[in-house]
């Protein structure tokens, strides 16, 4: 393990021994790194313009001109008149053959920056186009035949003795490098080309090859060639050539301790390379010193704590030379570390006998053997984490003669490593009071001061340390910087401190992983990958692999983690590494078995039957399902694991809680952590280790933020703040609680206050893209669009290679109504994220470059979801399969899925569309009256406006309705239709008197047809339309309405005013013509009653519209929606009695179950409405619509919705109970004359006729319809299923059934939706 995280044996032994014997203890900083890496996102913080221009040049080299143009346009948006931008613009124009445009760009560049290098380069490029291609081909032939000197002369002549054009510079200097006398000039020229464009892989290859030509730079060239091999996906030709050159260069090298590892590494990847193997066995300069190599490897392994490997290397050396004193002494040190004192003594004595001249090296080790047994016992206790017993034994040992200093130093080191800083400081000062210049005590006390932030005092102590400890002093200074970084939650400050530490210790893997961790927390994941690249690409030491394993594990890259574990000896496993190794083994075994079953539950239970003392097993099983998107079984695994034993260990609680946070269950995580208290042991009686306390604090902060966000989504900002307050107070510098507080203000309808907080965080750390995204959104929410645009532009300039910067830009552009620009922003974000994800996955595959695996996927278990999102369906996932194959990037990566969904939605919103369908509707009732059958063919066109934020919709709906045929022979039905009561009475009277007159005709039924036009405008908070009921119906009405629905946090207010047709019947929908109006009987009646009857009787009646005014409040509280509202309406129609309605309702529904692609909601609804008059009849003046005087209903609706691949569905069913009451109503409410006649007919026929012969007594009794009170069940269903054939074409089928009041209604429709956009 790292020598800076270990404990010394004793001061006396260390001072007198030639080699330090180290005691391995848990690596605190490494474990902290593993627990802190729970979030990731993409970022890069290089100069934006240069990065974009480098990209443009890269795409130009690949001849992908569209990509080059996009990168160049982005650079132009940042600095349109920058010389380097104009230079690349000219290169692009030249590449696509537009020489005139390139010449114009050159003239503009010479005006903007006369004499600049950019102008010169572009001028050279245009000049190169005038070069004779035949001369150039001849020169290239000379170079190809090995005549480099002549070729260089030809190039110089071609360039008129000047600088080569940019496009020919690489081949010119590459040829020059083959001329020994001109090699320095060639190297300088290639170095300049590479510096000007690092993305030029061809130049990188030429430069690396040229360096290998010279022995003084050969190793640097090898390093560059190895780096180039990692760019197989970006530059496959150059990567392959680099591999060939690397192999060739190996054959030029001598075989020595420096070069042998490189050759062995090549052979491990290319075991069939017999030529290189022969070169190693029989090098040109004679055989290598095999014994010396083995001995050197043994001491390196011993220093790294790899005892088994060191023993094997020393034994190999002794097989060659059994009297090798250094190897014998090395075996003695190995035996002493292993606790075998007798064997150690034998080896030391043999080493002293083999070479008396070096005997003094081993005598101090022999002298220390007297107490080594007791120290070995202490080491075993420490290895077993029995720190209390180890401290007691050291205190006893310190009281023995001559052991005070050594035992006290070891005790102080142990106290310091276990967090007892004050006690360690006291012990160090005790030693220094006796031995003021004890070097180890001075360094130990300096470490304490560094950890406490007393940098000045620590450096004063280190100034007293001798030069022989220079390396240790440097390590302590670096440790101090890392301690200072760990004590600040200011991410920008932390990164700055750790960069300073890495500058002092560039190869230290623990510095690198802490810096990478800090960069990830800041959002700079791409930069974090670059920081870790050297140790991941070429892990030299066990510590490199340990740090790499912790990094890749925290990044979720299991394949790379397994790859690094394969190269690490189990002897080098720390507790954290061992836990990771166990988790990888469990996941791999379970994944292979899951592919053979359909139900994973038995396998989960079986996997969790074994003991799980650290929590690694439960986490492994849960994480396997989490990575597959199966949160149901992930939660099940954690629930089983955390309830198998009552007394969970701190490691188990911390591990399970961390995994619960990854699956967004902060409540379960908080419940697991509650027994740990604050970690001091006051609640449990056992204090946690420092790294466990740090993990506990991080989890508690994440839980506070997550619970606050959940309550915020439910609209309970007060309780949300109560949860958040401890996190705000515990660390006032922490960013995530501040951003959560801003979200609370935003949820409370105060986006201005949220913006203030977001801007304050952003001012403190301008690189924090999470804060920048939040600020952009808050600025848009508070109608500060110009500020949002400025903030987003700054983010793009700061981090042009970070997807989140472009997502913020998309928010700003969409708010400004720039639809196409928004899509470009989102596509840019998608491409950046895809590059990262594909790079990560490619690296885990066979033969892929390890450097591409450095960028972890973006997963943030603490990130809140927006209001209302909990009711939406998730992106489709592959269900039912547990194969080990990886999903495609855009479906398995959360950020990619989100961006792809936004692009898809925005493209659809921006695309005009056409819908067409065929629908049928049937409503119960008597034939010829209440019964209604409808067929319609809606044709709808939609035109998006304002970047899809609003739309203009045009529709025309051909419609046919019919009521069936009236039963003309029914003495019950006929009188209740139109004015047929009088006709029936006349006909029966005529028949009774045998007058012989012609009987009046009775209407047999009604059918109507027409088309309904409509124009609608709508956006997120207002909708308005104007149209008409079907033109062609007897009565046509102008219709329309407007609705306002502003939203304040989780609360939506709806206010609407509308005029709509009542479509209960043919009468109410289209109106009816009274056939009696122009009949002989009708004309006779008007003659008799004159003007009085003409005013009360017309040829048509019906066509009822409701003029409705409604208000409603809706509140989204997490997964629950509450609503309540009421309204008032006035119903009018042609020759129909005016009516009025009041209505009110309240209800709620909540999400009761969901997974990645399905949901179930259940609710309750209470409804009331009542009309002033009962107009549910079909005589003249009645409206023909259900209008009870009071109606009450309580229903329970259940909704089931989901989607799978291209199919989606939505089914809602409800059942309830209704009670309604209808008053009696006159036959002819609008005509006193007709009603008077009805009264006369009713009284006469009721008294003198029998029902079989005349009008039904039941029908005409008092000429009033009777009232009624009814109670019973109500309910129905509404179902829709849709299938998307392509991105443009979608087909929907829907059906419904409803029973309410005194009617039932059913309907069905098939419709097609077509988006007018490119495939």
Swiss-Prot record:
Keywords: Cell outer membrane, Cellulose biosynthesis, Membrane, Repeat, Signal, TPR repeat
Main localization of the protein described in the UniProt heading: membrane
Compositionally skewed regions (Low complexity) per UniProt: 841-855
Metabolic or biological pathway: Glycan metabolism; bacterial cellulose biosynthesis
Species: Komagataeibacter xylinus (Gluconacetobacter xylinus)
Alphabetized Pfam families for the sequence: BCSC_C, TPR_19
Signal peptide: 1-46
Family label: Belongs to the AcsC/BcsC family.
InterPro entries: BCSC_C, Cell_synth_C, CellSynth/LPSAsmb/PSIAsmb, TPR-like_helical_dom_sf, TPR_rpt
Gene3D superfamilies in the cross-refs: Tetratricopeptide repeat domain (1.25.40.10)
Name of this chain's protein: Cellulose synthase operon protein C
């Amino acid at each position: 393990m790292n020598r800076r995280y270990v404990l010394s044996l004793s001061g006396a032994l260390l001072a007198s021994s030639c080699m330090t014997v180290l005691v391995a203890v848990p690596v605190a900083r490494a474990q902290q790194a593993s627990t802190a890496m729970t979030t990731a996102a993409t970022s890069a913080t290089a100069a934006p313009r240069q990065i974009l221009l480098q990209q443009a040049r890269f795409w130009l080299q690949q001849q992908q001109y569209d990509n080059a143009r996009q990168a160049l346009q982005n650079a132009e948006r940042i600095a349109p008149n920058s010389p380097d931008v104009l230079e690349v613009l000219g290169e692009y124009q030249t590449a696509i053959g537009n020489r005139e445009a390139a010449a114009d760009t050159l003239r503009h560049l010479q005006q903007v920056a006369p004499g600049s290098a950019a102008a010169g380069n572009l001028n050279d490029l245009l000049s190169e186009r005038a070069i004779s291609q035949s001369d150039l081909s001849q020169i290239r032939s000379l170079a190809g035949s090995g005549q480099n000197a002549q070729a260089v002369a030809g190039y110089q002549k071609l360039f008129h003795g000047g600088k080569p054009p940019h496009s020919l510079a690489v081949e010119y200097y590459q040829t020059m490098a083959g001329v020994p006398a001109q090699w320095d000039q060639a190297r300088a020229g290639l170095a300049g080309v590479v510096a000007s464009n690092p993305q030029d892989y061809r130049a990188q290859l030429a430069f690396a090859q040229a360096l290998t030509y010279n022995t003084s730079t050969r190793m640097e060239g090898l390093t560059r060639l190895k780096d180039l091999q990692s760019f197989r996906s970006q530059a496959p030709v150059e990567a392959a050539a680099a591999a060939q050159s690397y192999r060739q260069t190996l054959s030029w090298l001598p075989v020595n301790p420096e070069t042998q590892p490189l050759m062995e590494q090549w052979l491990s990847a290319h075991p069939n390379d017999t030529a290189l193997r022969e070169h190693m066995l029989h090098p040109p300069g004679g055989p290598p010193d095999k014994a010396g190599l083995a001995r050197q490897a043994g001491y390196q392994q011993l220093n790294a704590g790899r005892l088994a490997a060191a023993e094997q290397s020393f034994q190999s050396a002794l097989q060659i030379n059994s009297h090798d004193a250094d190897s014998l002494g090395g075996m003695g040190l190995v035996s002493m570390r292993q606790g075998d004192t007798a064997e150690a003594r034998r080896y030391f004595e043999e080493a002293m006998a083999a070479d008396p001249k070096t005997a003094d090296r081993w005598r101090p080790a022999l002298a220390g053997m007297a107490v080594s047994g007791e120290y070995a016992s202490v080491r075993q206790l420490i290895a077993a984490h029995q720190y209390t017993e180890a401290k007691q034994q050291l205190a006893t040992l310190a009281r023995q003669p001559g052991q005070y200093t050594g035992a006290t130093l070891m005790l102080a080191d142990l106290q310091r490593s276990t967090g007892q800083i004050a006690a360690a400081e006291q012990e160090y000062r005790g030693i220094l009071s006796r031995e003021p210049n004890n070097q180890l005590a001075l360094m130990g006390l300096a470490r304490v001061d560094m950890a406490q932030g007393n940098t000045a005092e620590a450096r004063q102590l280190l100034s007293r340390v001798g030069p022989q400890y220079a390396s240790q002093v440097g390590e302590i200074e670096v440790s101090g910087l890392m301690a200072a970084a760990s004590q600040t939650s200011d991410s920008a400050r932390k990164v700055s401190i750790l960069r300073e530490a890495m500058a002092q210790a560039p190869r230290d893997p623990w510095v690198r992983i802490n810096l990478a961790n800090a960069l990830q927390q800041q959002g700079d994941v791409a930069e974090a990958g670059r920081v870790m690249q050297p140790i991941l690409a070429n892990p030299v030491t066990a510590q490199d692999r340990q740090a790499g394993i912790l990094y890749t594990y925290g990044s979720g890259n299991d394949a790379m983690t397994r790859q690094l574990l394969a190269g690490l000896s189990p002897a080098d496993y720390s507790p954290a590494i061992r836990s990771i190794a166990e988790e990888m083994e469990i996941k791999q075994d379970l994944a292979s078995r899951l592919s053979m079953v359909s139900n994973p539950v038995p396998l989960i239970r079986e996997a969790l039957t074994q003991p799980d003392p650290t929590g690694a097993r439960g986490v492994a099983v849960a994480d396997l399902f989490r990575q597959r998107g199966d949160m149901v079984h992930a939660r099940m695994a954690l629930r089983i694991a955390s309830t198998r034993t009552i007394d969970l260990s701190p490691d188990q609680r911390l591990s399970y809680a961390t995994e619960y946070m990854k699956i967004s269950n902060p409540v379960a995580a908080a419940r697991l952590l509650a027994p740990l208290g604050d970690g001091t042991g006051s609640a449990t009686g056992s204090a946690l280790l420092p790294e466990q306390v740090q993990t506990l604090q991080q989890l508690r902060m994440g839980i506070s933020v997550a619970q606050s966000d959940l309550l915020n989504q439910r609209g309970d900002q007060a309780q949300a703040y109560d949860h958040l307050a401890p996190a705000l107070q515990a660390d006032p510098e922490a960013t995530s609680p501040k951003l959560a507080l801003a979200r609370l203000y935003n949820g409370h309808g105060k986006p201005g206050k949220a913006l203030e907080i977001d801007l304050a965080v952003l001012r403190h750390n301008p690189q924090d893209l999470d804060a920048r995204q939040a600020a952009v959104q808050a600025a848009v929410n508070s109608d500060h669009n110009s500020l949002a645009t400025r903030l987003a532009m700054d983010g793009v300039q700061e981090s042009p290679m970070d997807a989140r910067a472009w997502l913020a830009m998309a928010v700003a552009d969409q708010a400004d109504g720039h639809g196409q620009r928004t899509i470009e922003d989102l596509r840019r974000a998608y491409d950046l994220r895809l590059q990262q994800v594909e790079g990560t996955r490619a690296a885990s595959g066979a033969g892929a470059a390890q450097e591409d695996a450095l960028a972890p996927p973006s997963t943030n278990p603490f990130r809140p979801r927006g209001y209302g999102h909990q009711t939406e369906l998730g992106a489709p996932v592959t269900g039912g399969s547990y194969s080990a194959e990886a999903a495609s990037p855009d479906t398995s990566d959360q950020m990619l899925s989100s961006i792809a969904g936004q692009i898809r939605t925005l493209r659809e919103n921006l695309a005009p569309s056409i819908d067409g369908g065929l629908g049928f509707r049937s409503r119960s009732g008597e034939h010829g009256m209440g019964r209604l059958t409808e067929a319609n063919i809606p044709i709808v066109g939609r035109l998006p406006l304002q970047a899809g934020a609003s739309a203009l919709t045009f529709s025309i709906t051909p419609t046919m309705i019919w009521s069936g045929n009236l039963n003309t022979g029914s003495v019950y039905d006929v009188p209740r239709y139109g004015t047929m009561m009088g006709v029936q009475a006349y006909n029966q009277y005529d028949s009774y008197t045998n007058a012989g007159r012609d009987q009046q005709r009775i209407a047999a039924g009604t059918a109507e047809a027409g088309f309904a036009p409509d124009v609608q405008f709508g956006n997120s908070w207002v909708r308005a339309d104007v149209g008409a009921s079907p033109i062609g119906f007897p009565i046509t009405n102008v219709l329309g309405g407007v609705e306002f629905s502003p939203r304040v946090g989780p609360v939506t207010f709806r206010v609407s005013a509308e005029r709509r047709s009542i479509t209960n019947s043919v009468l109410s929908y289209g109106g009816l013509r009274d056939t009696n109006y122009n009949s002989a009987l009708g004309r006779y009646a008007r003659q008799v009653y004159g003007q009085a009857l003409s005013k009360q009787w017309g040829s048509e009646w019906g066509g009822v519209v409701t003029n409705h005014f409604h208000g409603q409040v809706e509140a989204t509280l997490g997964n629950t929606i509450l609503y309540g509202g009421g309204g008032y309406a006035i119903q009018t129609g042609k020759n129909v009695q005016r009516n009025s309605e009041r209505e009110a309702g309240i209800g709620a529904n909540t999400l009761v179950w969901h997974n990645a692609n399905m949901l179930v909601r259940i609710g309750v609804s209470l409804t009331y409405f009542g009309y002033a008059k009962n107009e549910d009849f079909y005589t003249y003046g009645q409206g023909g619509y259900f209008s009870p005087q009071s109606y009450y209903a309580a229903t329970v609706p259940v909704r089931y919705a989901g989607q799978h691949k291209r199919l989606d569905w939505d089914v809602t069913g409800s059942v309830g109970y209704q009670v309604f009451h209808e008053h009696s109503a006159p036959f002819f409410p609008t005509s006193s004359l007709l009603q008077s006649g009805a009264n006369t007919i009713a009284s006469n026929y009721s008294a003198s006729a029998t029902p079989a012969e005349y009008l039904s007594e039941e029908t005409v009794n008092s000429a009033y319809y009777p009232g009624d009170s009814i109670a019973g069940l109500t309910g129905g269903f509404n179902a829709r299923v849709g299938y998307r054939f392509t991105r443009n074409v979608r087909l929907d089928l829907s059906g419904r059934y409803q029973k309410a009041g005194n009617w039932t209604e059913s309907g069905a429709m098939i419709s097609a939706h077509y988006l007018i956009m490119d495939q």
